[in-house]
Curated annotation (Swiss-Prot):
The gene is secA. Belongs to the SecA family. PANTHER family: CHLOROPLAST PROTEIN-TRANSPORTING ATPASE, SECA INNER MEMBRANE COMPONENT OF SEC PROTEIN SECRETION SYSTEM. This is Protein translocase subunit SecA. Its main location: membrane. Its EC number is 7.4.2.8. It comes from Nocardia farcinica (strain IFM 10152). GO terms for molecular function: ATP binding; protein-exporting ATPase activity. It is an enzyme of class 7 (translocase). It is found in: Cell membrane; Cytoplasm. ATP binds at Q87, G105, E106, G107, K108, T109, D494. Keywords: ATP-binding, Cell membrane, Cytoplasm, Membrane, Nucleotide-binding, Protein transport, Translocase, Translocation, Transport.
Length: 937
């Protein structure tokens, strides 16, 4: 309930905001007549004028009225669409960093043109985020026509694009793409080994389309880049041999319900005998414990042909709920490898997390964030709490006259679907278009078979082929059209009564080989005549559909979120058109089963109602709404929990990525390295002198450790007076100062040696090489350890401890330890690396992966010539290969794809030489001229 109270509080002052936006919109509309008089060239010149005024000190708020008026006039000349007052209000709300709640069909895509144009004038880039690649490409081409006409560059980020193509797209004034693509590019940039490999250029302003879907539905699944771990597969095979020898209830116990195992003392002793070790639990052997646990779990908890199948020498997971095989999915934390070892198939490398971020924390990187949706009101509290975004409801352009009928509840699912088919057949007969919403692909296919059996022509959309689905949705408003769609299918495309003329005209032009990006001039010349021709065809159909009652939306099941139900309903009744909606439910529906469906079934049984007679009661509708509210609250808590845990990682990630950025950008790291030497020597001395008296210090042991770190020139016996036979008291401070002076002196000699070998400035380059390599490896190891910590942290609740507080505390301790290890390893490498001058590489020949192909002349050193590149053995700048990308699909579920899919078979992050990348960028940049307007002057 607190969220509901907060929602009401957040809506206080809404009226004032809407009035302010309406006043701004009136002023923009009043400027319209001034800009109508301008020629195309004069209108385009306004962009440069605005940029100059911004550079001279005017703010974007100062430019808002004029910039909006220019973009509005350009939209009319290019698209034959002029923003309504409510769309201008929506655009202003977006610019001010709010979520504009605009009903379906109110023109959100066109609305976005206004704030995107205004904010692009700053030159810092604008990101427009959509739910799938098709919409990103469509909007970049379609709305990009307006921006290109006004002299701005538009880019689009799609799956399968190479890094040079992505770099060009991000360099554009406005960049379209999906949340996953933007997020993964951010993570990859923070795995890059050279400035040339970076693709993004900052996070200035983002407009998120379908903001509730992206920031809420998909926020439960974090973005993860994983790659092969370094673990050896030898141990999987060894423990697969041992596991069958262990006896249940003698060596270990199993809890089938909780899916856990526990190893007894007898089991530990048996394993120690088998491996020939003294203590399984000593520090050096601790990794073996997880191999043992996984081997026993593979034996007892994972059954072949139930939990997984073996096909073509590969272990494939079976979904426990649907029974479908999940190709490409793998169990994590070594479990999949343990099953592979048990089955005797080839053991694939274990994956580990290399980089991760939640969508919440990614979008909080932006200086300004805004979004559009038709249904944000129910989640206003969450959007405010997590993203600090206000929700502004924008009035509809025309009054809504759709009729929302009350729900019909049937006893069985079969009776419900029979009633659905009867209702659809009747409406199809009278020429009324029908959109049927389902919650799954299986339900869609089942209904499709029923319609085929009854001879009802129909189309099925399953959110798999977005481009074809947009074409079907464009014609879903035709008389008598019947369209079956899952909740996610065909989003972003309006169902216009009689047919969507813009989409249909675009399809016709593309069939003729015309394209708004590739052939802008020919496309623009043919656009208006084709559009007028299509409008003439669809106008008559639209009148017939209005006579039949408009679009009828039929839901076959209530979704657990009211928002999804409202999205489905919102397909009907756009722009003041007539329409109708109704939900058909059954007691077998998921939501009804979860929340007191048994009580309702008892009532229906007592009333002795036949299966095919529905009940229609407000009490039931209220109960369903209450159930949905409970589920929404549960999901909110899950997302909040994900965010709380990621907040720990986020602070650590900010430190590490900030440090990486400094190194990549060529900052002088000498001061930092000197501080590292001081910290490491101090830690060594403090550890060795923890006992208060000199006679208790083991200085020989300290010197042995120091000699592995750097070439020590001091003799401790000299410091204590043993050499000259005059023992003297040595304080901890004196010892520390002497060693620090010696270490810094040794580092100065090392710098002379390196600079003498490869030229002045070479030591600075080596520092950057070493720090970057060690930082990346330590961060990967830290992520691996944090994954393990998070996996078992929930058990702390059994000891009356808050798992989150424990995770924060231990996570901080682990991070501090990781930073200490990073300093120690970096200092050791810098003193002891074997370095040789790199011979020039012939074109096309790659450097051995075990060697560092170093940074060239990235530092503006005052030396007469750039330092010669060095090879440092054991240091690598090669980006990890064979990566997997895990992120939410449109339904919020985790989906996995590989490097090859992400880059379309191209090479990952460091694709091509610098010259090749520049050539690709130039080629990509060609043909970016703005289209000509149809208007003649």
């Amino acid at each position: 309930m607190p969220a509901l109270t907060l929602t009401r509080l957040l809506r206080i002052g809404e009226g004032r905001t809407v009035k302010r936006l309406a006043h701004l919109a009136d002023e923009v509309l009043a400027l319209g007549s001034d800009y109508e008089q301008l020629t195309d060239a004069e209108l385009r010149a306004k962009t440069d004028e605005f940029k100059q005024r911004y550079a001279d000190g005017e703010t974007l708020d100062d430019l808002l009225l004029e910039a909006f008026a220019v973009a509005r006039e350009a939209s009319w000349r290019v698209l034959n669409q002029k923003h309504y007052k409510v769309q201008v209000m929506g655009g202003a709300a977006l610019h001010l960093g709010n979520i504009a709640e605009m009903k379906t069909g109110e023109g959100k895509t066109l609305t976005c043109v206004l704030p995107a144009y205004l904010n692009a004038l700053s030159g810092d880039g604008v990101h427009v985020v959509t739910v799938n690649d098709y919409l990103a490409k469509r909007d970049a081409e379609w709305m990009g026509r307006v921006h290109r006409f006004l002299g701005l560059e538009v880019g689009v980020i799609l799956g399968g694009m190479t890094p040079p193509q992505r770099r060009v797209a991000y360099a554009a004034d406005i960049t379209y793409g999906t949340n996953n693509e933007f997020g993964f590019d951010y993570l990859r940039d923070n795995m890059a080994h050279s400035l040339d490999d970076l693709v993004q250029r900052g996070h200035n302003f983002a407009v998120v389309d379908e903001v509730d879907s992206i920031l809420i539905d998909e926020a439960r699944t974090p973005l993860i880049i994983s790659g092969p771990a370094d673990a050896s597969s030898k141990w999987y095979a060894e423990f697969a041999r041992i596991a069958p020898l262990l006896k249940k209830d003698v060596h270990y116990e199993v809890d089938i319900k909780k899916r856990t195992i526990g190893v007894h003392e007898a089991g530990v002793e048996f394993v120690e005998d088998q491996l020939g070790i003294d203590n399984l639990y000593e520090a050096a052997n601790s990794p073996l414990v997880s191999y043992l646990n996984n081997a026993i779990k593979a034996k007892e908890l994972y059954q072949r042909d139930k939990d997984y199948i073996v096909r073509d020498g590969e272990v494939i997971i079976v979904d426990e709920f649907t029974g479908r095989i999940l190709v490409g999915r793998r169990y994590n934390e070594g479990m999949h490898q343990a099953i592979e070892a048990k089955e005797g198939v080839e053991i694939q490398p274990e994956n580990q997390t290399l980089a991760t971020i939640t969508l919440q924390n990614y979008f909080r990187l932006y200086d300004k964030l805004s979004g559009m949706t038709g249904t944000a009101e129910t989640e206003a509290a969450e959007l405010h709490q997590i993203y600090n975004l206000g929700v502004v409801p924008i009035p509809t352009n025309k009054p809504m006259i759709r009729v929302d009928q009350s729900d019909l509840i049937y006893k069985t699912e079969e009776a419900k679907f029979n009633a659905v088919v009867d209702d659809v057949a009747e409406r199809h007969e009278k020429g009324q278009p029908v959109l049927i919403g389902t919650t799954s692909v299986e339900r869609s296919e089942y209904l499709s078979k029923q319609f085929t059996r009854r001879g009802i022509p129909h189309s099925v959309l399953n959110a798999k082929f977005h481009e074809q689905e947009a074409q079907i949705i464009a014609e879903a408003g035709r008389p008598g059209a019947v369209t079956v769609a899952t909740n996610m299918a065909g989003r972003g495309t309006d169902i216009v009564l009689g047919g969507n003329p813009d989409i249909i005209a675009d399809i016709l032009l593309r069939k003729q080989g015309l394209d708004p990006v590739e052939t802008p001039e020919e496309y623009e010349a043919a656009w208006l005549p084709t559009l007028e021709q299509v409008k003439a065809q669809t106008a008559a159909d639209a009148d017939a559909v209005r006579e039949a009652g408009g679009l009828y939306v039929l839901g076959t099941e209530r979704h657990e979120s009211r928002r999804i139900d409202n999205q489905l309903r919102g397909r009907s009744g756009r722009q003041g058109d007539p329409g109708e909606s109704r939900f058909y439910l059954s007691l077998g529906d998921e939501l009804m089963r979860r929340f007191n469906g048994a009580a309702l079934e008892a009532i229906m049984t007592r009333l002795n109602l036949p299966d095919d007679v529905p009940i229609e009661a407000k009490m039931v509708s209220k109960a369903i709404k209450s159930a949905q509210t409970q589920v929404e609250q549960q999901n909110f808590e899950i997302r909040k929990n994900v965010l709380k845990y990621d907040e720990v990682m986020n602070q650590q990630r900010t430190v590490i990525y900030g440090e990486r950025n400094r190194i990549l950008r060529g900052e002088d790291m000498e001061g930092q390295v000197q501080n590292m030497i001081t910290d490491v020597i101090t830690a060594y001395v403090d550890g060795a002198t923890a006992e208060g008296y000199v006679e208790d210090w083991d200085l020989e042991k300290l010197w042995t450790a120091l000699k592995t770190l750097y070439p020590v020139s001091l003799d401790y016996r000299e410091l204590t007076g043993e050499l000259d036979g005059e023992p003297r008291d040595l304080s901890r401070e004196e010892l520390r100062e002497a060693l620090l002076e010696d270490a810094h002196s040794a580092y100065a000699k090392r710098e002379q040696e390196i600079d003498g070998l490869a030229g002045e400035g070479s030591m600075r380059n080596l520092e950057r090489q070493v720090l970057l390599s060690v930082l990346d490896r330590k961060w990967r190891e830290h992520l691996y350890e944090m994954d393990y910590l998070k996996e078992g942290i929930g058990l702390r609740a059994m000891a009356q401890r808050d798992p989150l507080v424990e995770y924060q505390r231990e996570g901080f301790d682990m991070f501090t330890a990781m930073l200490d290890g990073l300093k120690e390893e970096s200092v050791g490498f810098l003193f002891n690396l074997q370095v040789e001058v790199q011979q020039p590489q012939p074109t096309g020949v790659s450097v051995d992966p075990g060697l560092r192909s170093p940074v060239g002349a990235t530092v503006p050193a005052p030396a007469p010539a750039a330092p010669t590149p060095l090879l440092a053995k054991g240091i690598t700048d090669q980006a990890p290969r064979g990566l997997n990308y895990i992120g939410p699909d449109e339904g919020g579920r985790a989906s996995v794809h590989s490097d090859a899919e992400e880059y379309g078979g191209g090479t990952p992050a460091a694709a091509g030489t610098r010259r090749e990348r520049r050539e690709a960028a130039r080629a990509e940049g060609k043909g970016k001229r703005g289209p000509k307007s149809r208007r003649k002057h």
